[in-house]
């Protein structure tokens, strides 16, 4: 594997005293390729800094999809739920979200549990109807957790939300790079599943 070779070579050069870590640079063609290097550098204790880009797991599309997985697994993470409630756009405004958050705080329940009770929040009115499809989607995905793999679940999230279709419709270089990042995330999940006896 290329990333492993590069990590070993950098460590050997630093150990021999020929170079310092700061003397080394890795160039790659697409941002999606950075993940492999980042992971090898972390495992190999090689300090690194990404120049002209963003850490793989800090990219919007990756954070969005991981927030979906986190919400499906455990909807008690209010930040994850709030991150994805309008991804893709569902027309749920800030006022509605604040009213749900107020209800959750008053009832001492999670934001997601408050979303599930949208019909019972008097201040929401017709806005409650916009919340239902999101809650239904998460509940359907939660029901599949025990019967499909994480990679299949991730693919279903992408398909059902239309995440990649929206990016394809943008037809920009940035959108293409984001699709490559999503493909790289799927590859990472598949590799994890293949390497683990009981992947979760």
Which ranges hold each PLM region?
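A short beta-strand-loop micro-motif that forms or neighbors metal/cofactor-
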Residues: 104-116
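Helicase P-loop NTPase motor core
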Residues: 1-47, 70-74, 106, 128, ...
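Conserved short internal alpha-helix adjacent to the catalytic or cofactor-binding core
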Residues: 43-46, 54, 58-88
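Conserved helicase motor
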Residues: 28-31, 51-59, 185
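C-terminal helical "lid" of AAA+/P-loop NTPase domains
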Residues: 98-103
């Amino acid at each position: 594997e290329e990333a492993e070779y590069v990590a070993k070579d950098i460590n050997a050069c630093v150990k021999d005293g020929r170079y310092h870590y700061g003397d080394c640079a890795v160039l790659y063609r697409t941002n999606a390729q950075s993940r492999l290097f980042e992971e090898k550098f972390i495992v190999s204790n090689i300090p690194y800094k990404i120049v002209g880009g963003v850490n793989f797991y800090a990219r919007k599309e990756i954070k969005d999809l991981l927030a979906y997985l986190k919400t499906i697994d455990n909807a008690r993470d209010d930040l994850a739920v709030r991150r994805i409630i309008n991804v893709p756009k569902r027309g749920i405004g800030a006022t509605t979200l604040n009213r749900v958050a107020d209800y959750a705080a008053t009832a001492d329940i999670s934001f997601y549990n408050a979303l599930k009770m949208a019909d019972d929040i008097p201040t929401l009115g017709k806005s409650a109807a916009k919340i239902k499809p999101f809650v239904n989607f998460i509940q359907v995905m939660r029901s599949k957790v025990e019967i499909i793999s994480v990679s299949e679940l991730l693919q279903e999230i992408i398909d059902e939300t239309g995440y990649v279709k929206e990016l394809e419709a943008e037809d920009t270089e940035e959108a293409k790079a984001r699709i490559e990042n999503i493909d790289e995330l799927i590859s990472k999940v598949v590799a994890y599943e293949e390497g683990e006896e009981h992947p979760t």
